[in-house]
Amino acid sequence: MELYYLSAKEITEKIKAKEISAVEVAKATFDRIEAVEPKIQAYVTVTRELGLKMAREVDEKIARGEDPGPLAGVPVAIKDNMSTAGIRTTCSSKILENYIPPYDATVVEKLKEAGAVFTGKTNLDEFAMGSSTENSRFFPTRNPWDLERVPGGSSGGSAASVAAGEAVVALGSDTGGSIRQPAAFCGIVGLKPTYGAVSRYGLVAFASSLDQIGPFARTVEDAALLLNVIAGHDPKDSTSADIEYPDYLSFLNQDIKGLKIGLPKEYFIDGIDAGVKKAIDDAIKVLESLGAVFEEVSLPHTKYSLPVYYLIAPAEASSNLARYDGVRYGYRDFEAEDVVEMFSRTRAEGFGAEVKRRIMLGTYALSAGYYDAYYLKALKVRTLIKEDFDRAFTKVDLLLTPTTPTPAFKFGEKTSDPVSMYLSDIFTMAVNLAGLPGISVPAGFDGHLPVSFQLIGKPFDEGTLLKVAHAFEQNTEFHKARPKL
């Protein structure tokens, strides 16, 4: 097996046992990036020099007999909406194209302390607004399984980098499905933790009540390993939960016999691709054979999650993105004759079409006369969506649904119809609205394209999701498949 396709656990074990060096793994990964990146375009910035320096530091620590950390020598990609001191952080937008932050996000600090090796910053839909990575200012990222298709979004670069062997694990952010949907399209594991479980300090805000950082990995074990590193209370994030966080790896080999899994009838609807439906049915059979018990549940307000999301998220975005005005940092139009013209021209030239669409929509929803009719009503329905989940969890331990209605779609297929694009996140949005954890797990193929299922858990019960996902993974072979590049 090529070094870049080893799991994070295998890499740390081999490096600590001195079977391989961190520098060897880093070189193999950067060589892989050089070889396949022209096809995939997962990265906005590749940090080869920094990565090799970090790898050398791991090897030096081991030589001195020091503990190199739980991610010793593991190549990690970081979505380009997380602050990295001294490394360009663009959000794939013209407005931040040359922005170099002076500080690290909390998750980035934690990765450094854990001995990770940074491969670079990955491409995304501009300001994380999109479902296909076609909204990037720079270029679209391609799906490693089919270069004519999207990798999903908004964390498409992170998902594609892990699937293509350009990183071993990666960080993404998930506001309405932006980790789980690209993980499904690229055939890897993607976990959105409970809101508040991972610090948002240093994550460029899109919708602050929905955003959450989480891991991409090729195995459930690697996702648990990365979650161990990034989860935890952070006083710099006022929404960070001050609770005891478990060792997520300790859940992996637990028995799932007798676990009750709910199947929400509102998620098994017309419009689901036949290949996705078959993969879900097969996954249910595997979990039943391991002793899990299934029952139908109802989440009646699910049907409102799309309109609720597209009122709340743009409303928060319109407020958060007001800071990009050309005054303090980022792009500025120097041709303007006065400050008002400078504001308007900077924003008109700096933001792409989808970002402008959402700023307009959010500003409208928050404006006088419409605030109560739209935004306030959406907040009330959000509460009803959350209460549906609370009721379901009195009967079952977790829920199983499709992650996406279809496998990855072709470039340009949905760009002219925003609502059709938004519908690709129809099964993931409610999880963000309710602040719950969700994981996308590879469940097979529809032709040559990966398909997945989603597990949704109670707040801060990532352990149960990881336990069930790992049990499924250990009894199937889907996670071992690799794209031919």
UniProtKB/Swiss-Prot annotation:
Molecular function, one GO term: glutaminyl-tRNA synthase (glutamine-hydrolyzing) activity
Classification via Gene3D superfamilies: Amidase signature (AS) domain
SUPFAM superfamilies reported in the protein's UniProt record: Amidase signature (AS) enzymes
Pfam families tied to this protein: Amidase
Gene Ontology cellular-component terms listed: glutamyl-tRNA(Gln) amidotransferase complex
Catalytic activities: L-glutamyl-tRNA(Gln) + L-glutamine + ATP + H2O = L-glutaminyl-tRNA(Gln) + L-glutamate + ADP + phosphate + H(+)
PROSITE patterns: AMIDASES
Gene Ontology biological-process annotations: translation
HAMAP family attached to this UniProt entry: GatA
Protein name, entry field: Glutamyl-tRNA(Gln) amidotransferase subunit A
Gene (UniProt): gatA
